């Protein structure tokens, strides 16, 4: 199958790629979206991008993500990022649950996945990585959403969903953005103005807490307790505030590389059913690589993996793994096609302007 990857770029990134192709030195940051198992289609891309654009860099690169992207980027930011992402993938695929798991069981299994690729002994590798600067987005819960009981969370999320129909800015009534960043280099290229944003330097004591919090889905997992400024906060999935990284990036002669599982950017968690909700911010520096619609249609269920797979294949992990491994194989083909375009320079001909 040919033409299985789609490459879209904003005005500045498009001009750069048309002129010189995609060069390592031009990449100032990598972006990653929330989305649970959807990331599996990107596993192959993560590996080739690490080898081509992250390994043996001279200048630093921000790794900015929420939810599952935080986990991918944490794995890639270990001393051996290739081994890190492979260890994460292996334990992620191996997760198992009872027929009706509660949030305590799911939280415990998620912690086990985290420990498998990021034990305490490896945290320092991320904190002191010579070039990769991890930025972890989490959501601090407010009002009813601070409590881990089904009623409070259900009502709070319902109110959030309704207010979001009128304006995405109203999500800020329910969540604050807590952004954990590399203490050596503030992520000044992100010019956040929506919601209240609290910036917290990463260290050996809070990094794993931030990674876990960024993927803690409300109603599915327990909120993560975080002590800051003498107060106790409940942090949840970063996708609640920044689902697919519609970020206000500063202008400049750089590229924000975005391996994504979709050719559409959905700004917020509650925007998923809102087909009219478009990215708010300029995407001029973004180059987004995603599977083509034809590639996704070639999979046996005509879709990429998602969280529903745990219910669809409950009690039958062999069928789930068959589908997931098939997706990995397709993702590898996408990765190989993308790198051939980069290395040959033909990316200049394949890149297209963003569809808005």
Feature locations, PLM:
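Patatin-like phospholipase
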Residues: 1-62, 75-356
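Catalytic nucleophile serine of serine hydrolases
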Residues: 67
């Amino acid at each position: 199958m040919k033409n299985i990857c789609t490459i879209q770029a904003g005005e500045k990134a498009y001009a750069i790629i048309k002129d010189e192709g995609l060069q390592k030195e031009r990449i100032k940051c990598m972006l990653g979206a929330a989305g649970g198992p959807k990331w599996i289609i990107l596993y192959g891309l993560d590996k080739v991008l690490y080898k081509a654009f992250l390994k043996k860099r001279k200048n630093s690169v921000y790794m900015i993500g929420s939810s599952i992207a935080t986990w991918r980027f944490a794995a890639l930011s270990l001393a051996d990022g290739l081994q890190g992402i492979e260890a994460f993938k292996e334990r992620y695929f191996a997760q198992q649950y009872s027929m009706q798991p509660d949030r305590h069981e799911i939280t415990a299994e998620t912690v086990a996945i985290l420990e498998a690729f990021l034990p305490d002994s490896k945290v320092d590798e991320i904190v002191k990585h010579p070039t990769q600067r991890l930025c972890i987005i989490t959501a601090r819960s407010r009002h009813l959403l601070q409590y881990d009981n089904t009623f409070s969370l259900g009502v709070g999320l319902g109110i959030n969903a309704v207010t979001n129909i009128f304006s995405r800015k109203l999500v800020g009534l329910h969540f604050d953005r807590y952004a954990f960043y590399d203490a050596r280099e503030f992520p000044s290229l992100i010019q956040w103005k929506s919601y209240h944003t609290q910036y917290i330097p990463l260290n050996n004591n809070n990094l794993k807490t931030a990674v876990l919090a960024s993927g803690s889905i409300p109603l599915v997992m327990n909120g993560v307790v975080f002590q800051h400024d003498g107060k106790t906060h409940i942090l949840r999935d970063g996708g609640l505030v920044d689902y697919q990284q519609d970020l206000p990036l500063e202008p400049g002669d750089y590229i924000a590389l975005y391996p994504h599982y979709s050719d559409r950017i959905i700004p917020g968690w509650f925007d998923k059913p809102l087909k009219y909700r478009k990215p708010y911010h300029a995407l001029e520096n973004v180059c987004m690589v995603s599977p083509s619609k034809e590639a996704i249609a070639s999979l046996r269920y005509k879709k990429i993996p998602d969280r529903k797979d745990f219910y669809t294949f409950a009690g039958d992990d062999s069928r789930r793994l068959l589908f997931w491994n098939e997706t990995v194989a397709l993702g590898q083909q996408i990765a190989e096609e993308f790198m051939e375009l980069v290395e040959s320079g033909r990316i200049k001909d394949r890149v297209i302007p963003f569809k808005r």
